[in-house]
Amino acid sequence: MQQQNRRRGRLSSKTNAAASSDTEPQKKVTESKPRLPAMDSMRFFLIGYIAIGHFIACATRDPLLLKMLSQVNVVVGAFFVLSGYVAAYTASELNKYEHTEKRFLPTKVAYTIQRVMGYYPLYFATQILFMPVFLIADVTYNGWAKSALHAGLTFSLSQAWFPSHAELWNAPTWFLSALTFAFVVLPYALPSIAKLKRKGLQRLFVKLILLTCLVKFAYCYDVSGFAFFEGTMPPKTHPSWMFWNSVRFSPLFSTIDVLIGAVSARLVMIDGVEKVNFDSVLQKPVIPLLLMIGLIVGRGYSIVSMSDAIARSIFVPLFAWFTMNIHRETVSSSPRASQFSISSVLSWKPLTYLGAISFPIYILHGPIGQIFYKRVVANKIFGFVFTSKPEFFPVWIGIVLVSAAIVNEVFLKNKKVQELSKNVSNSLVSLSISE
């Protein structure tokens, strides 16, 4: 009897061990990824710089200040990298060489629809709300027929495909037009990227960097513009402004930057199965951060003479490097809580809140700026243009920030808006399946 009890005990322990080993993989599957609040703050700093850069010429004529804050064409590449980074982080598995299948169900088209519907509702609402502002300028210069065509291009997010019309209506939103194409590509690219091991990812990273460098080099070579500073350059003085537009606005070339971000994310996400040397100085976020700042400041002070295109091809891998290091520093358990780190600063709640309202800032700063600074619009509304009042610039910044905070609370967090957006998204997904 005692022997039977011992056998049962051994069997029970084996059964429990087997059960625990069976459930262990399930825990890994359902385990959520660590949150990366620093990414929100990084988004705010990028958007803040871009928003100020778009209108700084309306507030100052100081050459140094203009050069320091007009490198928007350089910094916007980092915005695409961050978008690709987040997309890969949310749609692939941690410490596994596979994508997250449910993110691409029921079809790959559904992934694109869901990503686009994440930003289209506010974009659409802004188009409607500020349409009178957009039409004042468009109808004045182009007439009603072309304005109607331009409305179709902007509402369909097709404007980035037209080099001379990429900045129609709400100029900064050409970014969303290009990003939309990237989200068409990603559901087909991410599953393959997720399968790659570190060496494969590193090779792909280098190839993407070389490809984007080739594009920028070809442009600079053909226009003899290696030393151009396009951010402050009048279009009439450029040998081929259309060529420049076709490079900086191209959805195809922007997708390369998005893929660089996706590959960067995967390089960090497999750290648990392919170890890296965390003690290396190259893993410190401060190194790429200083190099990025040095690039911007060096060009501002004319210490470094290079075109926006070449600078962007350098800035993009530096930002990818910085983002990977911030990610590793955020999830690392080695630094003590008392130690200073850039990731802890970027995770500060006021900064993450600004990160939360950064998308409304990006959408709203353009049309609000047009009201005060676009000559044909401001003269129609106020009888003068606010470029004559440089002291108004901080007020404009305040108006944008307050408006973004209100929109975040009233529109983005609105349950009815969220429900309507979800219903539209589901309907479009169902339509894509039926086809």
Model-derived regions: residue spans:
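Membrane-interfacial catalytic/cofactor-binding modules of polytopic membrane enzymes
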Residues: 228-232, 237, 241-251, 260
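Secreted, luminal/periplasmic, and some membrane-associated catalytic domains
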Residues: 276-279
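Alpha-helical transmembrane segments of multi-pass integral membrane proteins
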Residues: 250-258, 262-264, 283-416
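Structural signal for the C-terminal ends of transmembrane alpha-helices
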Residues: 88-96, 135-136, 188-197, 262-273, ...
